[in-house]
Amino acid sequence: MRVLIKNGIVVNADGQAKQDLLIESGIVRQLGTDISPQLPCEEIDASGCYVFPGGVDVHTHFNIDVGIARSCDDFFTGTRAAACGGTTTIIDHMGFGPNGCRLRHQLEVYRGYAAHKAVIDYSFHGVIQHINHAILDEIPMMVEEGLSSFKLYLTYQYKLNDDEVLQALRRLHESGALTTVHPENDAAIASKRAEFIAAGLTAPRYHALSRPLECEAEAIARMINLAQIAGNAPLYIVHLSNGLGLDYLRLARANHQPVWVETCPQYLLLDERSYDTEDGMKFILSPPLRNVREQDKLWCGISDGAIDVVATDHCTFSMAQRLQISKGDFSRCPNGLPGVENRMQLLFSSGVMTGRISPERFVELTSAMPARLFGLWPQKGLLAPGSDGDVVIIDPRQSQQIQHRHLHDNADYSPWEGFTCQGAIVRTLSRGEMIFCDGTFTGKAGRGRFLRRKPFVPPVL
């Protein structure tokens, strides 16, 4: 299979140029002007369009069982939506397994979920839900098998205490793995939530009030210090929602500590006023949506380089699930938002087209840095000879309004309903194969490959 993309503006994190791009057998073979292939190939005219590396979304939750519900996107519908949104690689955060289970148990479960279903290439983050000698001994073996990042939780059912966190940080660091963490102060949240429930205050607004930004920021500061105590272990903060936490991360960076951070479109573009609407239960996620001032602080981090990655935390529960389970009580509502199909378009429209970020910075946030941090570079996140032929073509001249009826996930709503975006995704190619074309999904279930990731090597801070 040969594909020649002509006349587009090819963009990598380190520059852009109007040039052609030739893909053969799923691999980028040549970039240059006026490429004339020796053999017949499919030609795509990308005149007036940007040609970007396919998106790498390092934070999804497909087919996750949270105890009270299972998310409604599996590895087919979830990766189909990703493909239609210009994302060609996902790294899914595995959910909790049975009490006391080994790390390998969850890996085998999740490989079963994805096999024969995933449309695009995929990998997983391990999850450490308890600490004992067997788990610690298992970590190096998992890294050898291609899982080079693991998630810790400071809240929810399988939260770790500080001693357990230190043990995990040390062993992960020694084993060549990156520690990722969901940082919220569980005790403070439980106290606030109990107060509201006792007072009968269970509307969606109280979800946000029960998880104030200080709960998140305190946990970020604590993890930064614990990582330092654990021998300067590398640390990756997921789904940052506030400026105070970002300030702590800036300080750690100034002290040459290896820390990185992601945020998500919902924290850049949605705010806490959504909880006061008739459909407020649609927006229950943790950490919750913040105010516009926090959005502005995050945009500063996007613009000046303090934020490294934009991912989605895609975790879809339908409105029907939310209403049936919660019965109007925020504390009983499953948490999470859909968004894997909208990430690239939303950031391009609100970032590149507004002048907040350059096209190169867009690549850094959506594909290059995710690939570098999580052991996929230069196979992913780069358009250069030898890299995978993963491409998204965006036409900046087109304007689109997001409507859920045109999306490809398995939810029954979109938090982005009615958003108007400048710039449209017109083609997605995965290893040279067209999987999305002018509004139509053209991929197939099971073509995605499991990616064995390299051990963690820190990018230059």
Curated annotation (Swiss-Prot):
> What cofactor is this protein dependent on?
a divalent metal cation
The record lists the organism as Escherichia coli O127:H6 (strain E2348/69 / EPEC)
Against SUPFAM superfamilies, the record matches this protein to:
Composite domain of metallo-dependent hydrolases, Metallo-dependent hydrolases
Family, according to the entry, reads as follows: Belongs to the metallo-dependent hydrolases superfamily. Hydantoinase/dihydropyrimidinase family.
Q: How is it modified after translation?
A: Carboxylation allows a single lysine to coordinate two divalent metal cations.
> GO cellular-component terms in the record?
cytosol
Q: Which residues carry this modification: N6-carboxylysine?
A: 151
Instruction: Tell me what reaction this enzyme catalyses.
Output: D-5-phenylhydantoin + H2O = N-carbamoyl-D-phenylglycine + H(+)
In terms of superkingdom, the source organism counts as: Bacteria
Which InterPro entries does this UniProt record tie to the protein? Amidohydro-rel, D_phenylhydantoinase, Hydantoinase/dihydroPyrase, Metal-dep_hydrolase_composite, Metal_Hydrolase, Metallo-dep_Hydrolases_sf
Q: Which Gene3D superfamilies match?
A: Metal-dependent hydrolases, Urease, subunit C, domain 1
Binding-site residues for a divalent metal cation 2, renumbered to this chain: 151, 182, 239
Q: For this protein, what is the EC number? A: 3.5.2.-
MF annotations from Gene Ontology: hydrolase activity, acting on carbon-nitrogen (but not peptide) bonds, in cyclic amides; metal ion binding
Task: Please give the function described in this protein's UniProt entry.
Answer: Catalyzes the stereospecific hydrolysis of the cyclic amide bond of D-hydantoin derivatives with an aromatic side chains at the 5'-position. Has no activity on dihydropyrimidines. The physiological function is unknown.
**Glycosyltransferase is among the record's keywords:** no
Q: Which GO terms describe its biological process?
A: pyrimidine nucleobase catabolic process
Q: How is the cofactor bound?
A: Binds 2 divalent metal cations per subunit.
Alphabetical keyword list? Hydrolase, Metal-binding
Record NCBIfam families: D-hydantoinase (TIGR02033)
Q: What is this protein called?
A: D-phenylhydantoinase
Binding positions for a divalent metal cation 1 per the UniProt entry: 59, 61, 151, 313
Enumerate the PANTHER family for this protein. Answer: COLLAPSIN RESPONSE MEDIATOR PROTEIN (PTHR11647:SF1), HYDRANTOINASE/DIHYDROPYRIMIDINASE FAMILY MEMBER (PTHR11647)
Q: Does the keyword Hydrolase apply?
A: yes
Enzyme class, broadest EC rank:
hydrolase
Write out the residues that bind substrate: 156, 286, 335
Disulfide bond positions: none
